[in-house]
């Protein structure tokens, strides 16, 4: 074991955090459609299943908000 797997996991976590952070910023500023896309992107790079589910759920909620259904 040379630590590659660990650093690879850290990279995945960093990418998810980065994508999620952008999604939150868009969500807070009221840009729902863009936030939904950002959450979908975050779900795609999430290293854990529960994180993927959370990101998909947020994407769906943002999509509903942009269509006027809260």
PLM features: residue spans?
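TPR-adjacent "capping" and linker segments in tetratricopeptide-repeat scaffold/adaptor proteins
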Residues: 2-18
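Inward-facing hydrophobic residues that define packing positions of alpha-helical scaffold repeats
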Residues: 39-40, 46
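Alpha-helical junction/boundary sensor with strong preference for TPR arrays
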Residues: 45-46, 66
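Alpha-helical linker/edge segments of TPR/alpha-solenoid repeat scaffolds
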Residues: 60-70
